């Protein structure tokens, strides 16, 4: 299969969204507000470093040559959202993903989720403190008929299923249906997203994660 190829820079959001509090959590809506007012470049402009940096030209888009020091890039493409909002509940989440693209949701993070490797995750802790943001891009169903959300995390490709995860639908595990946000991109991209050998419903805008 093929995963989305158009990826924006989460590090710029960490650096520049005023009330997102960078790596210390915060308000997801402020990230969408920043994307509407300021725009976000492609990930190649500023790779994810999991650190809080000042919102300067150097920390928005930079270029590093083999024989020259890193320097800020002045001319680069930014991507914007035209509107954004709040959504909760499984049915409304699915309608939003189907109609307009991936959504961002806050979740709890118990130890066994940190150690997640593969398969459909089921929470056994009952923890409900929302402290981490992930993207929900679609949903699917196992051969045994178990429904699950398809989520993308920000902990690198070595975590989970190549940086992605599946979590059971219908139980609100990790509080995944309780606090989600959506954003509508201004530019309409076209991309193909699918998971081989699985029944899935994926958004055509998954490339904007």
Question: What do these predicted ranges mean?
Answer:
Residues 1-209:
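Catalytic-core signature of thiol
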């Amino acid at each position: 299969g093929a995963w989305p190829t158009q990826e924006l820079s989460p590090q710029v959001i960490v650096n520049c969204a005023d009330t997102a509090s960078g790596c210390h959590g915060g308000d997801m809506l402020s990230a969408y507000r920043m994307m509407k007012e300021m725009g976000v470049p492609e990930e190649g402009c500023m790779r994810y470093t999991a650190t809080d940096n000042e919102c300067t030209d150097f920390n928005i888009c930079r270029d590093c040559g083999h024989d020259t020091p890193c320097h800020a890039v002045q001319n680069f493409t930014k991507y914007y959202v035209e509107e954004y909002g709040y959504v909760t509940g499984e049915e409304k989440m699915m309608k939003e993903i189907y109609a307009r693209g991936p959504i961002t949701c806050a979740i709890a993070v118990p130890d066994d989720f940190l150690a997640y490797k593969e398969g459909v995750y089921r929470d056994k802790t009952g923890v409900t403190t929302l402290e981490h943001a992930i993207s929900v891009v679609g949903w699917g169903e196992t051969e045994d008929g178990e429904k699950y959300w398809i989520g993308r995390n920000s902990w690198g490709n070595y975590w989970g299923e190549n940086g992605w995860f599946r979590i059971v639908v219908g139980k609100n595990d990790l509080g995944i249906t309780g606090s989600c946000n959506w954003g509508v991109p201004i530019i309409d991209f076209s991309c193909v997203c699918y998971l081989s050998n699985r029944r899935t419903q994926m958004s055509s805008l998954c490339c904007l994660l």
